[in-house]
Amino acid sequence: MFFTNGVLFSALLPRYPEIKAHFGLSDTQFGLTVVAFAAGAICAAAAAAPMIRRWGATRVTWVGSIVLATTMAVAGGSPSAWVFAAALFAAGLTDAIVDAAQNVAGIAVEKSYGRSIINSLHAVWSLGAATGGVIGAVSAALDVGIGVQMVVNGTVWSIAALVASRLVTSGAAAQPVVDAPAATAAAEAGSPRAWRLLAPLVLLAICGTLIEDIANNWSVLFMRDETTAPVAVAGLAVSVMIGAQFVGRLLGDRMTDRWGREGVARAGGVLIGLGMVVAATSPTAAVALVGFALAGFGSATLVPAAFAAADRVPGLSPGTGVAMLGWLMRLGFLVTSPCVGALSDATDLRVALAIPVGAGVVAAVIAHLASRRRHAARADVVPGDMLEP
């Protein structure tokens, strides 16, 4: 399910330069257009947790995957920028619900296993996203129509999502999570203690997803416009960045067990900053790809760690902490692309990549402060429990 979620959306990303050129959008206009996806996700705020509680995480995931595939197909075949933005809005709304549901299902399976697997599950998402990037890049190189590509892509992976949901063996993932009334969920979401505990997790997750946003919306354009890479090579930027993230997540559980979540997150923030500096100052496409790979690897464990910690926030019913984090971290998407686009128009795209450099610094600082606070309090927390309530 994590794989199909990654591939359904990312297959369109290598075609963004074609879409931008077709509609005649400036960098600022393009940034404001693609932010529709994040705006849709924000509007899903109140929907995810009640749906998961009522119908169960796996059912919400596979039904949502079919809807996501449909909206992405509409985006690929859009006749105008307005239709494209509307389709992305609907896709973002659906994706936020699917994302929360698949994480609730994944955490339920993790609990039944009795060991950490959340980084590995997110690694599978990254593999799916990288696969989608390759599909889009190859389709662009072969001059396959964008609409045709997205219809075929959506059909294949919707079926795969349905099959995968049937294979989930954890009853906690398949069944309704809890029969909590809506008023209780609303009270939980408004709890000052819950917000205080979730705030650093949200900021950390935003730093991680910001790198994904750069990969999704700007890496291909950067490769084409700033390094003059051909379309097929430029399209690989998404796959390289997300592929490196996949490797980092594949190793994430092992690294976390050895160095702790704070240590891994701190190193990840440093790699994000270093990688984006390398990419922004790169003289060639090859060097830029190296920088994107470093940033992708550095961002690998930030979001999984935040989700795992959000599920343990005391006082919240199952699924609520994850749903709240999944919604709030998308607030970053509302400002990332518009800011990158505006700064790029005012200067150039190389300068605009200073924004993700800052995200790396923030992630490293959050992890460092969390580690200092834990040690200062001499809390009885096992290694790997980052920002534990």
Annotated model-derived regions:
Residues 24, 56, 77-82, 228, ...:
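Helix-breaking motifs and short loop linkers at transmembrane-helix boundaries and internal kinks
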